[in-house]
C-alpha cells in the first residue's frame, strides 16, 4: 500500500486518476436519494416502466445505494463521451431505406469497458487506504445513476430525463463506484433548460409526457430494445427507420452543440451497423446477426426482435418491389415476426396504390387541358 492520503487529497487524486483512465469527469456524492423516492414511486405507479418489471421489483432499492453495498458512504460518479466523429445522424435519418441505430450502440458494448475502468479506479484508491470496499456499477444494477450524477455535479437533469452538461451536452455514458470512505462531496450545478421544450416537441411518439418524465411505453428506445412482444400498431408509423434506440431528443437539444467526440476506439461505429440498408439487414441470418453484434449492446435483443424492428422500418419506407419481396421472404419464421411483416406489407401496398393514383391523376389533368384547348373560347 502507498502512503495514505487525507480525504481531501484523496478526492483530488481520484478525479485525476479518473481522467487518466479515460473518464471526462468525476464527481463525488453521498448516498442520500430520499428526494428521488417519491418521484420514482409515482413513475412506477403510473406504469410508465412498461414491461420492465425489474424496475418495480427492486422498488426503492434503486434510491438506496447503501443497501446495495452495506457500509457505502459515497458514490463516485463518472461520465465518458461516446459520440463518434462520423455519427452521420441526419443523412441516415433522412434516408428511409437505411436503418438508424442509436449512436451509443454503434461500437462496442460500453458496460464492460466502463466497469473495467471503474474497477481499476477502485484498485488505485485502495492503494492509498488502510481498508476500502468498493463496487462498480454501469447501468446494470438497481441504482438511480442520473440523480447520483446530478448530485455529484456532473450536470443537471434535462426535460428528456437525461443528464446535461454545459461543456459536453448529453452524449456520454454514466458509471458509479460505491465506496465506504467519507470523501468530501461535490455540489450540484445549476440547471440550464429554462423554458426550452425542444426535446418534448421533437419526440416522434410523444413519450416525454411532461417535463422530466418519460413514459417508456411510448419511447422508441423502449419499443425497440426492452419490449419483447409486439410493438403497438399506432406507434409503428411514428418510428420511421429507427431500428435500435432513438436520439431525437438529444439531437434537438441546444446544449449538444457543445458535445465532445469520444477518444475511445471501442466506440467507433462498426461498418455493418453504420447507415446500413434495411433490406440487407433484414436478410441477415441469426448466425450473421450474432457474428456482427458480438461484443455489441445490440446483441441482447436477439435476432427475432432485430427482425421485428426492421420489418416496421421497411413498412415505413417508400414503396419498393424489392422491399415487398424481402418481407414476403421471411414469412412463417415466427408469429411475432409474421405480425409485423403483415403490417409492413399492408403499408407498402397502400403506398403502391397511392403512387398509382398520383401517376394517373396528372395524366387525366393533361387530357382535360388538351380537350379544353380544342374547344371554342365561348364554349
Swiss-Prot record:
Cited function: Catalyzes the conversion of epoxyqueuosine (oQ) to queuosine (Q), which is a hypermodified base found in the wobble positions of tRNA(Asp), tRNA(Asn), tRNA(His) and tRNA(Tyr).
Disulfide bond positions: none
Binding site for [4Fe-4S] cluster 2: 203, 219, 246, 249
Subcellular location: Cytoplasm
Cofactor binding: number and manner: Binds 2 [4Fe-4S] clusters per monomer.
Gene Ontology terms for molecular function: 4 iron, 4 sulfur cluster binding; epoxyqueuosine reductase activity; metal ion binding
Cofactor field: cob(II)alamin; [4Fe-4S] cluster
PANTHER family xrefs: EPOXYQUEUOSINE REDUCTASE (PTHR30002:SF4)
Chief site of localization: cytoplasm
Assembly and interaction partners: Monomer.
4Fe-4S ferredoxin-type domain residues: 181-213
Alphabetical UniProt keywords: 4Fe-4S, Cytoplasm, Iron, Iron-sulfur, Metal-binding, Oxidoreductase, Queuosine biosynthesis, tRNA processing
Name under which the protein is recorded: Epoxyqueuosine reductase
Binding site for [4Fe-4S] cluster 1: 193, 196, 199, 253
Amino acid at each position: 500500500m502507498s502512503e495514505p492520503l487525507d480525504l481531501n487529497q484523496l478526492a483530488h487524486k481520484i478525479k485525476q486518476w479518473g481522467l487518466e483512465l479515460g473518464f471526462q469527469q468525476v464527481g463525488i456524492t453521498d448516498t442520500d436519494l430520499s428526494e428521488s423516492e417519491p418521484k420514482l414511486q409515482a413513475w412506477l405507479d403510473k406504469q410508465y416502466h412498461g414491461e420492465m418489471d425489474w424496475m418495480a421489483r427492486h422498488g426503492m432499492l434503486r434510491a438506496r445505494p447503501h443497501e446495495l453495498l452495506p457500509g457505502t458512504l459515497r458514490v463516485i460518479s463518472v461520465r465518458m463521451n461516446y459520440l463518434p466523429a462520423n455519427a452521420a445522424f441526419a443523412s441516415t435519418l433522412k434516408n428511409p431505406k437505411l436503418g438508424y441505430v442509436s449512436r451509443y450502440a454503434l461500437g462496442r458494448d460500453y458496460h464492460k469497458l466502463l466497469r473495467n475502468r471503474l474497477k481499476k479506479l477502485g484498485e488505485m484508491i485502495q492503494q492509498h487506504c488502510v481498508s476500502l470496499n468498493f463496487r462498480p456499477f454501469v447501468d446494470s444494477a438497481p441504482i438511480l445513476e442520473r440523480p447520483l450524477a446530478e448530485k455529484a455535479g456532473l450536470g443537471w437533469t434535462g426535460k428528456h430525463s437525461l443528464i446535461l452538461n454545459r461543456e459536453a451536452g448529453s452524449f456520454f455514458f454514466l458509471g458509479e463506484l460505491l465506496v465506504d470512505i467519507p470523501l468530501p462531496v461535490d455540489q450540484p450545478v445549476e440547471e440550464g433548460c429554462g423554458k426550452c421544450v425542444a426535446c418534448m416537441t421533437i419526440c416522434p411518439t410523444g413519450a416525454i409526457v411532461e417535463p422530466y418524465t418519460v413514459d417508456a411505453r411510448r419511447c422508441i428506445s423502449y419499443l425497440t430494445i426492452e419490449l419483447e412482444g409486439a410493438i403497438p400498431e399506432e406507434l409503428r408509423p411514428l418510428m420511421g427507420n429507427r431500428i435500435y434506440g432513438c436520439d431525437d431528443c438529444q439531437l434537438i437539444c441546444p446544449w449538444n452543440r457543445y458535445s465532445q467526440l469520444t477518444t475511445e476506439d471501442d466506440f467507433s461505429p462498426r461498418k455493418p451497423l453504420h447507415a446500413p440498408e434495411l433490406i440487407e439487414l433484414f436478410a441477415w441470418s441469426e448466425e450473421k446477426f450474432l457474428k456482427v453484434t458480438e461484443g455489441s449492446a445490440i446483441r441482447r435483443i436477439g435476432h427475432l426482435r432485430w427482425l421485428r424492428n426492421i420489418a416496421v422500418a421497411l413498412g415505413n419506407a417508400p414503396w419498393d418491389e424489392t422491399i415487398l419481396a424481402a418481407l414476403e421472404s421471411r414469412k412463417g419464421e415466427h408469429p411475432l415476426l409474421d405480425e409485423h411483416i403483415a403490417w409492413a406489407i399492408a403499408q407498402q401496398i397502400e403506398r403502391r396504390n397511392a403512387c398509382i393514383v398520383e401517376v394517373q391523376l396528372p395524366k387525366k389533368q393533361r387530357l382535360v387541358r388538351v380537350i379544353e384547348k380544342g374547344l371554342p373560347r365561348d364554349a
